[in-house]
């Protein structure tokens, strides 16, 4: 006869009808009883021949692939001009007393952050943008490239200019060794070189003169080719021109894919550049020099675009032009869907490349990428904006994987001990928190992203395209890329991006200037940074509480008026050091804080309502008597495990599911087991804050008996059969709780102290979790345990009762200073110029 739900509840001692605990509870440790119950509940994981169920509600399992959905209307989020101040430590010391060693150590970790993996694999640029959406290849390419350019303009990325140089926007840090302008400019004046000639897009450095070192040249001259005006006007090559010609004709094009001109300019170069770069042309004293405007630190740098040296000579030999996009301009349309129709829409398509405001020297950076990128929805609640996903998983795989540092994550009890109070709360939203932390330029070659340019990208992902590497840029295969799909996509994208289509069609290689989200080091660094900042805030306002986990930052104060003043002071401090807050997303919670998926109040902690609704929907759609794929069970356990501490039986109730996942077998929910779990999760109990106190109840056990010391009273008992020592100790703790009602119990068993009952017999673990719920344990050595003698049958001997205090722990998550003692008077308004008379003493 199958085990009914009511009988199962009585078996677990969850009803008040159970007999004496000392008789009933040891039975639950019996191995035969556990096997019989598991068999009655169909928990034995049989090899069923019925097909497995691979989908339950929103949970999918094996052999099910979620087709990603591309949104053609995705918006690229805007990023503020984030620049964390380099004198962060000094500003913190001005805000509060001298920083502690812990605070200084944590802040130095991120000023700047460093990342040096054991080995780095480099991939071709063709793999820079992942073909995540095969039906929307072109749209995805341009939206991803636009996202990358947005990050570069927002000071988050470096742009690779050459093998040893990069450019970026925004204010430089001291560790970013800037390459200065040379002493010669186009007008022959010495100074900043506002008209200095840069070497097209690559930014390759000119060779230093004889007698100087490479290092000194890097410090003295800015990127670019430095010629005198006379040499340019006469079209002659001086000594520097010969050096440039010999050194800077690379076998591999600087930008990684497309050839760009680095030769000397003459009339042919003038005609080719004026034909292909119809952006704002600036002609100085030399009328034969045609340039297009770039972006440098002065805003007036000149970009020289010429044909490769091999083509300079006679026009009869033909020219291999550097810009794939603009080659269509002077060709005959091949069809109604020829790309030349789009290119002829505009006279001025803008520059082929953009340069940053500053140029720096970098370690050797190949024209490759180390991780692919693609776009997804920003979050399940915001599908209008996109989020860039960067795949740097190579650093977490293989024999050369990086061992990421571990950091403290607050568990539920520590979080409740710390935040469960009668304070008023608010939470702050840090804009793009990861992108606040600067990365040392030496890490750039390990964190490269980019794209190979539209022509090569379309050729790789399209089976109909016939662009081959050795033919790239030749007129014979130019029109092979023309197709109806590409034509229609570009025509629609033209309405969004306009002439930027030309810029985005070129290859680009970018390295991270701020820490990326796709590397395991980033969460550690962000946690260290925010915890140090909160520690500074706590010491500046000892009467308040500031706490953070990753980018979630919360502030608490005794009254709403006080919280408003605290909010103003803290936000001003954070803004003064360069931390950007999204004030529109500041949430005022009142006395019930919403944090990390929990609701935390003075009464304790409960899961948030949206999680409770997910659990209800899960049980509503959970089938019975059908084998469910273990991968689906894994997802179900992930949801139920979050709320397990708030149920009667806790994690032990989920142990049959854990066993099926470990064995990679299907699991069949019997009606009784489903009803048991459903009842468990429909009635959630808050996890209460632990209170300090004095331990006056002690428990101890041997394999054959148990003993208790409750005040000056001693008790003992024996087991029917010898039990494992850990099981006996757990039973003794349950007896102590049942007989005394004390919420602080002393024991000498480390397993009982850990409060992890999943390794005990299943039925005993479920019952013990409910009996010991809300109980705090204190470790007492066996030699000093007053219950040691009773457990061995010696009631006549009474050891003196220990005065063993219990202090609630917050683990390694709290780094605040104790507040000074204060009277109970509470002023109506807080003035930060004088000490506050009302303080909250943390636990």
Curated annotation (Swiss-Prot):
Activated by host HSP70 and HSP40 in vitro to be able to bind the epsilon loop of the pgRNA. Because deletion of the RNase H region renders the protein partly chaperone-independent, the chaperones may be needed indirectly to relieve occlusion of the RNA-binding site by this domain. Inhibited by several reverse-transcriptase inhibitors: Lamivudine, Adefovir and Entecavir. One of its GO terms (biological process) is DNA replication. It catalyses: DNA(n) + a 2'-deoxyribonucleoside 5'-triphosphate = DNA(n+1) + diphosphate; Endonucleolytic cleavage to 5'-phosphomonoester. Residues 357-600 form the Reverse transcriptase domain. It holds the Pfam family DNA_pol_viral_C. GO terms for molecular function: DNA binding; DNA-directed DNA polymerase activity; metal ion binding; RNA-directed DNA polymerase activity; RNA-DNA hybrid ribonuclease activity. Its EC number is 2.7.7.7, 2.7.7.49, 3.1.26.4. The record marks 63 as: Priming of reverse-transcription by covalently linking the first nucleotide of the (-)DNA. InterPro entries: DNA/RNA_pol_sf, DNApol_viral_C, DNApol_viral_N, HBV_DPOL, Rev_trsase/Diguanyl_cyclase, RT_dom, Viral_Replic_Matur_Polypro. Residues 347-690 are annotated as: Polymerase/reverse transcriptase domain (RT). Residues 249-301 are annotated as: Disordered. The keyword Transport does not apply. Residues 262-276, 286-299 have a biased composition (Polar residues). It comes from the Viruses. Keywords: DNA replication, DNA-binding, DNA-directed DNA polymerase, Endonuclease, Host-virus interaction, Hydrolase, Inhibition of host innate immune response by virus, Inhibition of host RLR pathway by virus, Magnesium, Metal-binding, Multifunctional enzyme, Nuclease, Nucleotidyltransferase, RNA-directed DNA polymerase, Transferase, Viral immunoevasion. Transmembrane segments: none annotated. Residues 178-346 are annotated as: Spacer. Mg(2+) binds at residues 429, 551-552. Multifunctional enzyme that converts the viral RNA genome into dsDNA in viral cytoplasmic capsids. This enzyme displays a DNA polymerase activity that can copy either DNA or RNA templates, and a ribonuclease H (RNase H) activity that cleaves the RNA strand of RNA-DNA heteroduplexes in a partially processive 3'- to 5'-endonucleasic mode. Neo-synthesized pregenomic RNA (pgRNA) are encapsidated together with the P protein, and reverse-transcribed inside the nucleocapsid. Terminal protein domain (TP) is hepadnavirus-specific. Spacer domain is highly variable and separates the TP and RT domains. Polymerase/reverse-transcriptase domain (RT) and ribonuclease H domain (RH) are similar to retrovirus reverse transcriptase/RNase H. Belongs to the hepadnaviridae P protein family. Hepadnaviral virions contain probably just one P protein molecule per particle. This is Protein P. The gene is P.
């Amino acid at each position: 006869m199958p085990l009914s739900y009511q009988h199962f509840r009585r078996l677990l001692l969850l009803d008040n009808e159970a007999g004496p605990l000392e008789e009933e509870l040891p039975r639950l440790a019996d191995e035969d009883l556990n096997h019989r119950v598991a068999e009655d509940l169909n928990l034995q994981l049989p090899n069923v021949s019925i097909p497995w169920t691979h989908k339950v509600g929103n949970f999918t399992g094996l052999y099910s692939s979620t087709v990603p959905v591309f949104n053609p209307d995705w918006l690229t989020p805007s990023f503020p001009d984030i620049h964390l101040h380099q004198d962060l430590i000094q500003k913190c010391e001005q805000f509060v007393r001298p920083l502690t060693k812990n605070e200084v150590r944590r802040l130095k970790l991120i000023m700047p952050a460093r990342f040096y993996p054991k080995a780095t694999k480099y991939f071709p640029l063709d793999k820079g943008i992942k073909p995540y959406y095969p039906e929307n290849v072109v749209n995805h390419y341009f939206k991803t490239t636009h996202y990358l350019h947005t990050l570069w303009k927002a000071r988050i990325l470096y742009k690779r200019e050459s093998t040893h140089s990069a450019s970026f926007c925004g204010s430089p840090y001291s560790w970013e060794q800037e390459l200065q302008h040379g002493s010669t400019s186009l007008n022959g004046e010495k100074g900043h070189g506002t008209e200095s000639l840069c070497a097209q897009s690559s930014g390759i450095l000119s060779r230093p003169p004889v007698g100087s070192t490479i290092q000194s040249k890097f410090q003295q001259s800015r990127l670019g080719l430095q010629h005198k005006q006379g040499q340019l006007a006469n079209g002659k090559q001086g000594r520097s021109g010969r050096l440039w010609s010999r050194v800077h004709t690379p076998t591999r094009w600087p930008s990684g894919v497309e050839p760009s001109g680095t030769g000397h300019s003459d009339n042919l170069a003038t005609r080719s550049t004026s034909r292909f770069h119809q952006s704002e042309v600036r002609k100085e004293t030399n009328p034969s020099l045609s340039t297009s405007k770039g972006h440098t630190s002065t805003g007036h740098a000149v970009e020289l675009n010429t044909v490769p040296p091999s083509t300079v000579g006679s026009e009869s030999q033909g020219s291999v032009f550097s810009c794939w996009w603009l080659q269509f301009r002077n060709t005959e349309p091949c069809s109604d869907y020829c790309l030349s129709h789009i290119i002829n829409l505009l006279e001025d398509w803008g520059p082929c490349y953009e340069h940053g405001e500053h140029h720096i020297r970098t370690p050797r950076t190949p024209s490759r990428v180390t991780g692919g990128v693609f776009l997804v929805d920003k979050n399940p609640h915001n599908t209008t904006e996109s989020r860039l996903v960067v795949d740097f998983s190579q650093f977490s795989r293989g024999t050369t994987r990086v061992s990421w540092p571990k950091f403290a994550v607050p568990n539920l009890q520590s979080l409740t001990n710390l935040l469960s109070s009668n304070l008023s709360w608010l939470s702050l939203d840090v804009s793009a928190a990861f992108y606040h932390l600067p990365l040392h330029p030496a890490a750039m070659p390990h964190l490269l992203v980019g794209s190979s340019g539209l022509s090569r990208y379309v050729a790789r992902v399209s089976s109909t395209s016939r662009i081959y590497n050795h033919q790239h840029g030749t007129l014979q295969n130019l029109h092979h890329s023309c197709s109806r799909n590409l034509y229609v996509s570009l025509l629609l994208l033209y309405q969004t991006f306009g002439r930027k289509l030309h810029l985005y069609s070129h290859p680009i290689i970018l390295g991270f200037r701020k820490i990326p989200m796709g590397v395991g080091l980033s969460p550690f660094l962000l946690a260290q940074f925010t915890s140090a900042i909160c520690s500074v805030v706590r010491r500046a306002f000892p009467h308040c509480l500031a706490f953070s986990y990753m980018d979630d930052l919360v502030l608490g104060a005794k009254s709403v008026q006080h919280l408003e003043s605290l909010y103003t002071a803290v936000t001003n401090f954070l803004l003064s050091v360069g931390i950007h807050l999204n004030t529109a997303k500041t949430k005022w919670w009142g006395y019930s804080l919403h944090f990390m998926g929990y609701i935390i109040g003075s009464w304790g902690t409960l899961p948030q309502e949206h999680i409770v609704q997910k659990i209800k929907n899960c049980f509503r759609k959970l089938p019975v008597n059908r084998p469910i794929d273990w991968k689906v069970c894994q997802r179900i356990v992930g949801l139920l495990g979050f709320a397990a501490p708030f149920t009667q039986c806790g994690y032990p109730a989920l142990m049959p599911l854990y066993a099926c996942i470990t064995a990679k077998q299907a699991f069949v929910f019997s009606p009784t087991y489903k009803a048991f779990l459903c009842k468990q999760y429909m009635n959630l109990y808050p996890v209460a804050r632990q209170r300090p106190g004095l331990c006056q109840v002690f428990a101890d056990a041997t394999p054959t008996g148990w003993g208790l010391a409750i005040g000056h009273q001693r008790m003992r008992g024996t087991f029917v059969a010898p039990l494992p020592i850990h099981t006996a100790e757990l039973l003794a703790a349950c007896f102590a709780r049942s007989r005394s009602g004390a919420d602080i119990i002393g024991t000498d068993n480390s397993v009982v102290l850990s409060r992890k009952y999943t390794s005990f017999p299943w039925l005993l673990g479920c019952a013990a979790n409910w009996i010991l719920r809300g109980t705090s344990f204190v470790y007492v050595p066996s030699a000093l345990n007053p219950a040691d003698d009773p457990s061995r049958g010696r009631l006549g001997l009474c050891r003196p009762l220990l005065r063993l205090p219990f202090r609630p722990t917050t683990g390694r998550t709290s780094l605040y200073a104790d507040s000074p003692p204060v009277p109970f008077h509470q002023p109506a308004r807080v003035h930060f110029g004088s000490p506050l008379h009302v303080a909250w003493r943390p636990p």
